[in-house]
Amino acid sequence: RICPRILMECSSDSDCLAECICLEQGFCG
């Protein structure tokens, strides 16, 4: 999957860019 390496806080996958998913730590990855 394509995920820009930008540190973004999230509460769900929809908060993240491209194909990033929301990881357990509360950040996109």
From Swiss-Prot:
Pfam families: Squash. It is found in: Secreted. The record marks R5, I6 as: Reactive bond. Keywords: Disulfide bond, Knottin, Protease inhibitor, Secreted, Serine protease inhibitor. GO terms for cellular component: extracellular region. The keyword Secreted applies. One of its GO terms (molecular function) is serine-type endopeptidase inhibitor activity. Disulfide bonds join C3-C20, C10-C22, C16-C28. It comes from the Eukaryota. Inhibits trypsin. The presence of a 'disulfide through disulfide knot' structurally defines this protein as a knottin. Belongs to the protease inhibitor I7 (squash-type serine protease inhibitor) family. This is Trypsin inhibitor 1. It comes from Luffa aegyptiaca (Sponge gourd).
